[in-house]
Regions:
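Bacterial Sec-dependent N-terminal signal peptides
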Residues: 2-5, 13-41, 170, 203, ...
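Membrane-proximal, proline-rich intrinsically disordered regions
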Residues: 21-62, 324, 328-331, 338, ...
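Long, intrinsically disordered, low-complexity segments
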Residues: 21-23, 92-95, 169-171, 249, ...
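Short coil/turn linking the two alpha-helices of tandem helical-hairpin repeats
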Residues: 135-137, 142, 205-217, 424-427
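Short coil/linker segments at helix-helix boundaries
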Residues: 140-163, 212-238
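Flexible, polar/acidic helix-loop-strand segments at domain edges
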Residues: 281, 336-411, 606-610
């Protein structure tokens, strides 16, 4: 069973009590400590407990529920008031105590130094992950590298350290992990970390902090006002590029290619619907096992009653290039809007491997693959229904049935991290563009480009108007195209919200109109995917009784919340979904420190605006 080692680790941690609940929990007995730390097997088993912090198998496929281009029927966590000084609940340190306990006690000389250092490297990688999550969530926090065994320990009452201190320790931990983790080959189903995980994660961390310092330099979250001078944005971009380059030059990974595209399936989507991790590219993953019913992507994305009906917005889907590398326009020369079939034709192949395209087929109950349009009856609010994590067999749809492994880190991200860091530094060469952005576009079937979008071998020299309007305030054409590539390649992989935060761009979530596909006409049966069969009947008066296609009531206009609106345009109607309350005040970029925590430790400072 693919996840047996992680399960064993979780059971061991629970049975021995090493995952402490509080920072000042009672110390373990010397006998139990010696039992674990006197042999490599004990270190290995303890180290499995670190993996319990990873996304669950049930949630890993929908970590991007909160993002700008995702339309859904709830704001759930993004709205003003979603977290307050009285409701913030993520100020938890038990996972850190578990790691620090290991590091303090892994000193038994019965185990060789190299073996101890290997497991210390794994522990420090997970400590870096813990602190990066805290930095993204709260900004500066106290740095703690010891176990508190005394409630009177004065260090329990420390104030926050600066971002410099935190990011410096994270970098130190990741450097140590890279140097001392002995596993350098691809691991089984990529469920166990290796040294390349540390290097790739360093590129992610440094890229985040570099962008945060650049794009938040003049707002109320300005890092300069918190005593940060050790790391500049430029230095952090350099560190991000160097870490990514280490993986690119020395690691065992490459882009997965070779599967020809057909009916919504190809090399790109292989990465997300394979029952065994595609380890040539996927560097770290959550494994699932169908017999245990662990995955639920189909249930979450294809159910009319479960999940928030997350789907893509039209504004985002228009960023996908044409297959020849030219920008896409959703209008004809006469100004009329293109149909959904036209939207899906001759586009970047990731379009039809992320949402149901016009050529998409599913395996029905009889075992036959049949053309399948988006399901408008409670499943999709825009017509751009996700397939990226979804198995194509309808048998997976009801309950936790998915057995496809779920990537947490891919080599593609490393390429994008490198390209962005170099672009921000003004150093990305045509050769580097070709081995990063060009390689990703080539896998997506793109054959060329323009001076504005770049080709497969040359970076752009002028800004393409649509992507420039998408990211106002950014004028560098190379940075803009790298962002286009990043948002498309990594869509729905849990990175988008952090990207918006570091770019100071969460207003994109506020301003996306949440429009959907073109509905050519109301009150008439429509063939939405062009297969010759009617799929839907959108009505603003009375439903139709024919059960061979869906009947969907809509409101003509754009003034209704929480219902399907349709907006009159040249050539028909655009679907539109409204949800009141989309705002993003500046303070929202950081969570508040919970009031109860400040009451316990008055030396902690509240974040700006809270």
């Amino acid at each position: 069973m693919k996840n047996r080692y992680i399960i064993l680790g979780a059971l061991f941690a629970l049975s021995t009590g090493f995952t402490a609940c509080d920072m000042d929990e009672e110390p373990q007995s010397s006998a139990s400590v010696d039992m674990v730390f006197s042999a490599e097997k004990g270190l290995q088993t303890y180290a499995y407990s670190f993996y319990n912090v990873l996304p669950s198998r049930a949630s890993a496929s929908h970590r991007s529920e909160t993002l700008d281009y995702g339309v859904k029927n709830t704001l759930s966590g993004m709205e003003v008031g979603a977290y307050t000084v009285n409701s913030a609940t993520s100020w938890s340190w038990s996972d850190l105590r578990n790691i620090n306990f290991f590091l303090e006690n892994n000193t038994n000389e019965k185990v060789s130094e190299s073996i101890r250092n290997n497991y210390n490297g794994i522990a420090r990688l997970f400590r870096a992950r813990f602190y990066f999550d805290k930095l993204v969530t709260y900004g500066p926090v106290p740095w703690i590298d010891k176990v508190f065994n005394d409630a009177e320990d004065p260090d329990l009452y420390n104030s926050q350290d600066t971002r410099d201190v935190i990011i410096g320790h994270i970098i130190d931990d990741l450097d140590y992990a890279y140097q001392h983790i002995t596993q350098s080959d691809v691991t089984l189903n990529s469920t166990i970390v290796n040294k390349w995980t540390a290097a790739a994660f360093k590129s992610r961390v440094c890229l985040f902090e570099a962008a945060w310092r650049k794009y938040h330099a003049n707002d109320e979250l300005d890092v300069a006002r918190t005593g940060c001078s050790q790391y500049s944005a430029e230095q952090l971009y350099q560190l991000a590029a160097a870490a990514a380059r280490e993986v690119m030059d020395k690691g065992p990974y490459k882009l997965h290619t070779g599967t020809p595209y057909s009916e919504g399936r190809g090399a790109y989507r292989d990465l997300f619907i394979s029952d065994n991790t595609v380890t040539t590219e996927v560097m770290f993953a959550v494994a699932t096992d169908k017999t245990l019913g662990m995955g639920q992507a189909n249930w979450w994305y294809n159910s009319s009653t479960y999940g928030p009906h997350l789907c893509m917005s039209r504004k985002f889907m228009n960023t996908y290039l044409n297959i020849d590398g030219t920008p896409y326009s959703d209008k004809h020369a006469d100004g009329s809007y293109k149909t959904f079939v036209e939207d899906c034709t001759d586009r970047d192949l990731r379009f039809n491997q992320t949402v149901r395209g016009a050529d998409y087929t599913r395996k029905d109950a009889s075992g036959a693959y049949v053309p399948t349009a988006a399901n408008f009856t409670g499943h999709t609010l825009t017509g751009y229904q996700f397939t990226k994590w979804v198995m194509d067999d309808v048998a997976y749809d009801d309950g936790e049935n998915n057995d496809n492994d779920e990537p947490l880190m891919r080599y593609a991200e490393v390429l994008l991290n490198y390209a962005e860091a170099q672009a921000e530094l003004g150093k990305l060469t045509d050769a580097e563009w070709a081995e990063t952005i060009g390689a990703l576009r080539a896998r997506a079937g793109i054959t060329g480009g323009t001076a504005q979008t770049g080709t497969l071998t040359t970076k752009p020299t002028a800004a393409e108007p649509y992507i420039a309007a998408y990211y106002p305030g950014v004028s560098n054409p190379v940075v803009l195209e790298v962002r286009r590539e990043r948002e498309i390649e990594l869509a729905l992989e849990g990175l988008r919200l952090n990207d918006l935060k570091r770019w100071n761009a969460c207003d994109l979530w506020v301003n996306d109109p949440w429009q959907g596909v073109l509905i050519p006409a109301l009150n008439t049966p429509l063939d939405m995917n062009g297969d010759g069969t009617y799929d839907a009947y959108f009505y603003d008066t009375d439903a139709i009784g024919d059960e061979t296609y869906a009947s969907i009531g809509v409101y003509v206009g754009t003034g209704k919340n929480n219902v399907l609106n349709v907006e009159k345009v040249n050539g028909g109607y655009l679907m539109k979904y409204n949800y009141a309350g989309r705002q993003w005040p500046q303070r929202q970029y950081l969570y508040p420190v919970p009031e109860v925590v400040i009451q316990f430790n008055p030396n902690l400072k509240q974040n700006p605006g809270w």
